[in-house]
Amino acid sequence: MRSKAETTARILTVMIGCVLALAIGMWVSGDVGAMRDKVEKDARRVLPDGFVCQSSEGSRMKALVFYDPNDPDNGAKAMVYVDRTGLYGDGLDRKFAFGWFFRGSTPNAAPGKVEGLTVEGYSGVAYFSGTGVARIEMADGSGMEHDPALPLAWVGGENTRFFGADGSELPCAVHPF
């Protein structure tokens, strides 16, 4: 039979563990929410004509934002977060039924593809090679590719290139956090 001191110690240990888990969860979700809010705000900027992207770099995450300045809303079409857990995509405008999420770090992601990514008139497929290469292609042929073998696209950037429907590389505006 446990003593009163042992029982009290166990209860305190469980309570401290719960409080720590809650604090860590709130910190992580708050960090993601703050980044999303900032990038959503930045996504309303007017950029040069063409389907371009913006990179936002944080201490633990990188956000890549796809734009279509010819869209009536002049807003972002889609967004991809790259962090230690992999890739997370989300439509910035709530009217877009768009989003995808890959668990596991990108270099170790299982080979294969995920279909059914849609942004109103846009739809796409995401591919993983299993060797660190991730590629997202929209229905018109445009998209992005992350490949550790690619040279850095910009100072502080990732090994990522953005391409148009004709395969040509697209410019990328860089916005540091």
For every predicted segment, state its role.
Residues G124-G132:
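Structural motif
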Residues W27-F96:
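Extracytoplasmic low-complexity, Pro/Thr/Ser/Ala/Gly-rich segments
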Residues A9-S29:
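Hydrophobic membrane-insertion alpha-helices, especially the h-region
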Residues R135-F177:
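Ser/Thr-rich low-complexity repeats and stalk/linker segments
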Residues S55, D68-P72, D83, T118-V119, ...:
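Acidic surface patches and DE-rich sequence motifs
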Residues M1-A9:
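Short, Lys/Arg-rich N-terminal segment immediately upstream of the first membrane anchor
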